[in-house]
């Protein structure tokens, strides 16, 4: 039985040049399957809102929802490192709220670390959580909780001023004590520069190949989100078609009186 990965294992992977593979999970079955295949890190993302609950974006997701999904995922993991997103309004109000909510994700949700969005403006929050021994993953670039300010899901850091600010954000997150940082929706060249400049691992999503690791939404790589697929997603399977075909055959069997057959019935 493999032991659960720790912060030290993730940092060692960067030091040794081993790429870090990370995926989202929102329930026990998916978590168990990806853990069996050796995924390094699992993120219970607030992306559960649009991906699982059908929300338009991540902003409506609550702490209670995050804890519920985090607990389910934790039960499916044996060796992967578990990170939980801090949802909107769970850390922006004040430091006391941030400490309480991060603590709940660890205590009730069984997370090993929390992730929060922002650079320089959230450095104090990161420092506060690290001081209470909660590992933190930063998240800069395209931050989904900021979509109203950004005007949607737009690539960040394309202009010199933006790029310089993102470098400052990355350094601020590291100096505040984060052990890793997600770089989302930024030019590949800039992501490479940030990765080179930091001692902590960078996890890219739409940020090119030079990051220390990659993260994607499990439903995206399996083709379960049929309406929209971001450019940075590679689809590894078409599970939606398999599900629809299975449902179609089941409906047909029920309508025709073929199911349940004798082998599915008790005597």
From Swiss-Prot:
Known function: Catalyzes the reversible reaction in which hydroxymethyl group from 5,10-methylenetetrahydrofolate is transferred onto alpha-ketoisovalerate to form ketopantoate.
Classification via PANTHER family: 3-METHYL-2-OXOBUTANOATE HYDROXYMETHYLTRANSFERASE
Protein name (record): 3-methyl-2-oxobutanoate hydroxymethyltransferase
Record-annotated active site: 184
Binding site for Mg(2+): 46, 85, 117
Amino acids binding 3-methyl-2-oxobutanoate: 46-47, 85, 115
Compartment(s) of residence: Cytoplasm
GO biological process, one term: pantothenate biosynthetic process
Superkingdom as given in the UniProt entry: Bacteria
Enzyme Commission number: 2.1.2.11
CDD domains, alphabetized: KPHMT-like
Family indicated by similarity: Belongs to the PanB family.
Pathway: Cofactor biosynthesis; (R)-pantothenate biosynthesis; (R)-pantoate from 3-methyl-2-oxobutanoate: step 1/2
GO terms for MF: 3-methyl-2-oxobutanoate hydroxymethyltransferase activity; magnesium ion binding
Reactions listed under catalytic activity: 3-methyl-2-oxobutanoate + (6R)-5,10-methylene-5,6,7,8-tetrahydrofolate + H2O = 2-dehydropantoate + (6S)-5,6,7,8-tetrahydrofolate
InterPro entries from the UniProt entry: Pantoate_hydroxy_MeTrfase, Pyrv/PenolPyrv_kinase-like_dom, Pyrv_kinase-like_dom_sf
Gene: panB
Enzyme class: transferase
Pfam families cross-referenced by the UniProt entry: Pantoate_transf
GO cellular component labels: cytoplasm
Alphabetically ordered keywords of this record: Cytoplasm, Magnesium, Metal-binding, Pantothenate biosynthesis, Transferase
Summary of subunit composition and partner proteins: Homodecamer; pentamer of dimers.
Protein source organism: Syntrophotalea carbinolica (strain DSM 2380 / NBRC 103641 / GraBd1) (Pelobacter carbinolicus)
Co-factor: note: Binds 1 Mg(2+) ion per subunit.
Cofactor(s) this protein requires: Mg(2+)
